[in-house]
């Protein structure tokens, strides 16, 4: 099951999820791609968004306006839908219209496989390799991993710090994608955790899981996806869709 949180009043770019890209609302483009992988439901605090989705043949449900995060929103949706504790649930962000179905499918398969192991992760997510220039953008979250491909830390700052690098050192960073996989039970458990100081400092809710000692398994993917966080990002998206 894929759940897409869709808050209409985004702080940085209000109403971005209903902005049209070549005549199609962004949230519809995201959901249509997700539907190529699994059953998909949009969870929104806005009746307008719900009606837009349903008009385009996408299942959508109305959720509370009081949620602090998209994860809290999809947790409510999972309860409304009565999803079982063992079911793998993917959280796909409603502002990533370029996220390829193959990437979503890869994370789903990895979480399904890992959840059957001896030491299943609490949740899973994905990253792509990015350049030093890309890593300097605080809107692009970076992640560093342990030797078992689990996240050690996420930050808006460029991490790791390459102390002894030279001009010839091939620097690279891991850019986090806004894509998560849980089981039904781990999703509800995550939302029951108290927030952590690091989460509040970085404004990154995934740090809540790490702060409480939970594992986040990471997979590397190749993608051209990026989040639409500003009007400038939307202009970039319009150009890419126009050229494709």
From Swiss-Prot:
<dbReference type="Pfam" id="PF02348">
    <property type="entry name" value="CTP_transf_3"/>
</dbReference>
<dbReference type="InterPro" id="IPR029044">
    <property type="entry name" value="Nucleotide-diphossugar_trans"/>
</dbReference>
<dbReference type="GO" id="GO:0005829">
    <property type="term" value="C:cytosol"/>
</dbReference>
<dbReference type="InterPro" id="IPR004528">
    <property type="entry name" value="KdsB"/>
</dbReference>
<dbReference type="GO" id="GO:0033468">
    <property type="term" value="P:CMP-keto-3-deoxy-D-manno-octulosonic acid biosynthetic process"/>
</dbReference>
<comment type="function">
    <text>Activates KDO (a required 8-carbon sugar) for incorporation into bacterial lipopolysaccharide in Gram-negative bacteria.</text>
</comment>
<dbReference type="GO" id="GO:0009103">
    <property type="term" value="P:lipopolysaccharide biosynthetic process"/>
</dbReference>
<keyword id="KW-0963">Cytoplasm</keyword>
<keyword id="KW-0448">Lipopolysaccharide biosynthesis</keyword>
<keyword id="KW-0808">Transferase</keyword>
<dbReference type="GO" id="GO:0008690">
    <property type="term" value="F:3-deoxy-manno-octulosonate cytidylyltransferase activity"/>
</dbReference>
<comment type="similarity">
    <text>Belongs to the KdsB family.</text>
</comment>
<comment type="pathway">
    <text>Nucleotide-sugar biosynthesis; CMP-3-deoxy-D-manno-octulosonate biosynthesis; CMP-3-deoxy-D-manno-octulosonate from 3-deoxy-D-manno-octulosonate and CTP: step 1/1.</text>
</comment>
<protein>
    <recommendedName>
        <fullName>3-deoxy-manno-octulosonate cytidylyltransferase</fullName>
        <ecNumber>2.7.7.38</ecNumber>
    </recommendedName>
</protein>
<keyword id="KW-0548">Nucleotidyltransferase</keyword>
<dbReference type="InterPro" id="IPR003329">
    <property type="entry name" value="Cytidylyl_trans"/>
</dbReference>
<comment type="pathway">
    <text>Bacterial outer membrane biogenesis; lipopolysaccharide biosynthesis.</text>
</comment>
